Each structure stands twice: as structure tokens, then as C-alpha cells.
Amino acid sequence: MASPFISDRIQNHDDKVLLARITEYFEAFANADADKMDSMVADDYRMSDIPLGIVRSSKGAWYQQNKGFSSLMTNISVEAISLHGSSEPGSFAVLENVVRFTLKVDPPEVAKPNLPPGIKKGDSSGMIMLSTIWWNSDGKIARELEYGKLLWEGFDINAFNGW
């Protein structure tokens, strides 16, 4: 079975520890494995998810939000465009990526502002994302910052090749 984290474009990154951590984390996200993701983040973890309007979410709150995502979405994939940064303690990494998904259910009212207008159960969509992750001294994720935009009509991930 193919991985839901498509990393072809970043396989040659020099920092193999970083590549392994990023792969593990985004595979867990795409597999809707909130428990695995939770095990990779520090106790004092903080998440900011700008597309969702979340400025600061604690580890516990983000765990619950991730579990909620898995009840809403299926066929999740994450395709890496580029990876920069380091796995060194105190450093950060930036992953440019595209998240695609299909709705398992009709979206609840609270989720509708973050989805394309009129999207319903069985419809697919996605977002182009910039994910920034900071590492603590134990190699755990201390902070995460997500920026993104819904995919637009005619979106072509290959337009990002060759930067």
C-alpha cells in the first residue's frame, strides 16, 4: 500500500533525521492517527493553525481537534513540495505541501467557513500549506505553525517544480 505522505520531491534532503521525523508525522496525519501525532509532540506543545483561525492550541486541545478531523475526512494525502530546515534541537523545519481529502460526512456548520462553499459528503478538496515545526532538545515537536489556502480551480502542483 502506498504511503499517504508523498515525499518524492524531498527525498534528497541532506538531514535524514529531519526527513524521517517529517515523514513519520505527516504519515500519521494522513492516516488520521491522532495518537501517533500526540506521541511526537512535547508536553508544552503549541499549535497555531491560521486557516482554521487557531492562534494558540495546547497539546490536549490539538489532540482533540485532530480526532475531530478524522471523523470529518477520509482519503487524506499529503504531498510534499519542498523541505527546508534542520532536526537540530531548537531549530525548525518548513514543509511546503498539499493536503487533499474527501469529506466522510456533510460538514458541520462550524467547519463550513474553512471549506469550499457547498462542499458535501463525498466531495474532495485540498489546501496548499506551509507547515513550520520547531524541535525541542528531546527531538519532539515543541511548536507548529500552519498557513494555508484552499486549492483553486486549475491548481497544478507541478507548477511548483524547479524552484
Where do the language-model regions lie?
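C-terminal and inter-domain tail/linker signature
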Residues: 1-163
